[in-house]
UniProtKB/Swiss-Prot annotation:
Protein name listed in UniProt: Venom protein HR-3
Highest taxon, organism lineage: Eukaryota
GO cellular-component term (any): extracellular region
Annotated organism of origin: Vespa orientalis
Function: Mast cell degranulating peptide.
Primary location group: secreted
Keywords: Mast cell degranulation, Secreted
Subcellular compartments: Secreted
Tissues where this protein is expressed: Expressed by the venom gland.
Length: 9
């Protein structure tokens, strides 16, 4: 997973 996914999730 990417940093963006971490923030969205």
């Amino acid at each position: 997973a990417s940093v963006h996914e971490f923030l969205v999730k």
